[in-house]
Amino acid sequence: MCAEEAFAFFADPWNLEAITPPWLRFRILEAPRTLERGSLLDYSLRLFGLPIRWRTEIVEWRPPFEFIDVQLAGPYRRWEHNHRLRSADGGTEIFDHVLYRLPYEPVAALLEPVTVRRWLEAIFDYRAGQIEALLA
């Protein structure tokens, strides 16, 4: 699949439910039909069994190669997620880069390597498998 087609998949915020692990019980509460710069998304999920509401804004939108979302409200002190797509041999490579800070530092920093980091790795591994299956 070319970068344009893959980017179109990400431009539909409702596809997030299909690529998010079921154990998070992710549900979109409010979102536009198509993402663009300035779009707001409200959703709920469960982190470590606790109900969380999260609000995200799309702050950069550069079809078909990049977009960035930031958390406006949610569990992190800071969350910035850069999604990059690059045309590759017969398809598209997708890269995710996340910058985050936890609340309750420095205590949270002690737990981060064994909790949050592993949890995020599991989420992104699941997403990669789902994206590959859905966009094949």
Walk through the language-model features, giving the residues of each.
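Residues at helix-coil transition
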Residues: 11-12, 132, 136
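Glycine-rich portal/gate segments that line the openings of hydrophobic small-molecule binding cavities
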Residues: 17, 27-76, 90-93, 126-134
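Beta-strand/loop substructures that line and gate deep hydrophobic ligand-binding cavities in soluble
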Residues: 68-122
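Residue-level signal for short amphipathic helical patches enriched in basic/charged
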Residues: 1, 118, 126
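Hydrophobic ligand-binding cavity/cleft-lining segments
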Residues: 1-36
